[in-house]
Amino acid sequence: MIKKILSSKINDSQVNIALLILRVTAGVLMAHHGYGKLTHFSEMQTKFMDFMGLGMSASLALTVFAEFFCSLLLIIGLGTRFALIPLIITMLVAVFKAHSGEIFGDGQTAFLYLAIYVTLLLKGAGKYSADAVFFKG
């Protein structure tokens, strides 16, 4: 039992379950952030950071798109790598613009999401995803 716990060997099934847990957990938690912004859009649009010179409303809309809608795609694992691109950009903005690169301070959560999203971008959605069902091969 101890030998199995300490072993560095992992099989494909373990990796796929880990990817599922990572995808769903990050997706649900981030969708919650996006849902809050979506449901309070009118109050937030005049206070939101204009991070690309597009205006506060457009910046908020892009953030809601990433945090809520792309997170839903991430949860089911559909178009996972495409859905991760806006999420990664959003977290880069959060870490380096909103939190001034303070990864050990207020930007820690955004940096953690960024690390998760980059990991998923590199590895993909895994076997237990809509991508695996629709895009075999």
Residue ranges: model-predicted function:
Residues 1-39, 57-65, 69-137:
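Extended, low-polarity transmembrane helix blocks
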Residues 44-56:
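Perimembrane loop-to-helix junctions flanking transmembrane segments
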